[in-house]
Swiss-Prot record:
GO cellular component, one term: small ribosomal subunit
GO function terms (MF aspect): rRNA binding; structural constituent of ribosome; tRNA binding
Keyword RNA-binding applies: yes
Ranges of compositional bias, category Basic residues: 9-18, 109-125
Modified-residue entries (3-methylthioaspartic acid), positions: 89
Coiled coil: none
Superkingdom of origin organism: Bacteria
GO biological process, one term: translation
Assembly: Part of the 30S ribosomal subunit. Contacts proteins S8 and S17. May interact with IF1 in the 30S initiation complex.
HAMAP family linked: Ribosomal_uS12_B
Annotated NCBIfam families: rpsL_bact
Protein name: Small ribosomal subunit protein uS12
Ribonucleoprotein is among the record's keywords: yes
Length: 125
């Protein structure tokens, strides 16, 4: 336990908080180009083929980004927008692609939570 005079001489250091999304560099989203679009399998209790894109960002970083929703139109050289947000059962995937922006199409026939998947409002009969 330091004395008050020791604390006056050398104050306590504030703990540095490490960013969970370093590639975004404090931006809400970043643009990038897909270098590889592939499927991968999740961690132990789950089983699926998760859609993932490897993206080279405008700041030079290369990251893995999850493609949410049913079906997508991404391929190599597609320009995408990524946001933060990890996928718990895919190690190393800390970003999500934003659906419905740039080259990424929105999810077709989506009725609920449309804003998260870039779907337009369906025409009411």
């Amino acid at each position: 336990m330091p004395t008050i005079s020791q604390l006056v001489r050398k104050p306590r250091k504030a703990k540095q908080v490490k960013s969970k999304v370093p590639a975004l560099e404090s931006c809400p989203q970043k643009r990038g180009v897909c270098t590889r679009v592939y499927t991968t399998t999740p961690k132990k209790p789950n089983s699926a083929l998760r859609k993932v894109a490897r993206v080279r960002l405008t700041n030079g970083y290369e990251v893995s980004s999850y493609i949410g929703g049913e079906g997508h139109n991404l391929q190599e050289h597609s320009v995408v927008l990524i946001r933060g947000g990890r996928v718990r059962d895919l190690p190393g995937v800390r970003y999500h692609t934003v659906r419905g922006s740039l080259d990424t199409a929105g999810v077709k026939d989506r009725k609920k939570a449309r804003s998260k998947y870039g779907s337009k409002r369906p025409k009411s009969a």
